[in-house]
Design a protein with these regions (language model features):
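Catalytic lumenal/periplasmic loop and adjoining terminal transmembrane helix
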Residues: 2-132
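Core SAM-dependent methyltransferase catalytic element
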Residues: 125-150
Length: 150
């Protein structure tokens, strides 16, 4: 067999597994977060793509910077690195939890920055090699609007 063909197959397999592990982290985290919050609390989530889909499947509402109206006690979920990963600067929040993807040989080929394997540009390849955790999800409690007196 041709070395190039075998190498391409192995690389494709490793990237596919890494992408699957990335999606699995989002899927499990969305369910875990929703299960950990009382049903009477609204959970808001920012982000796009697979994370957005899993968040909606678990009853989270999409958070929009300029139009979402939060109540004290609501929970916000922000997956780091996705577009829309920001909140209004006038919100007072507290960190409730921080989740991150466990690393291992199957996550070494990381296709999970911004849009991962679905987006690239010159100098920014669609995947990287990394032994560090590349996914972090912040769970925040909403305390109310910031006042100028604080």
């Amino acid at each position: 067999m041709n070395f190039t063909l075998v190498g391409s197959f192995i690389l494709s397999l490793l990237l596919g597994i890494s992408d699957w592990k990335h999606a699995e982290f989002f899927k499990k985290s969305a369910a875990q977060i929703r299960e950990g919050v009382p049903a009477y609390r609204t959970v808001w989530s920012s982000g796009i793509g697979g994370w957005h889909w899993y968040a909606l499947q678990n009853g989270m509402k999409p958070y929009y910077l300029d139009s979402s109206v939060l109540k004290e006690g609501d929970v916000m979920v922000l997956p780091k690195g996705l577009s829309q990963y920001r909140i209004s600067s006038d919100l007072e929040v507290t960190l409730l939890a921080k989740l991150w993807q466990k690393t291992g040989p199957l996550s070494f080929f990381s296709g999970n920055h911004f849009l991962g394997l679905y987006h690239n540009n010159f100098g920014n390849p669609p995947w990287t090699l990394s032994r560090n955790s590349t996914d972090t999800i912040y769970v925040l409690g909403y305390l109310g609007k910031r006042s100028d007196n604080k």
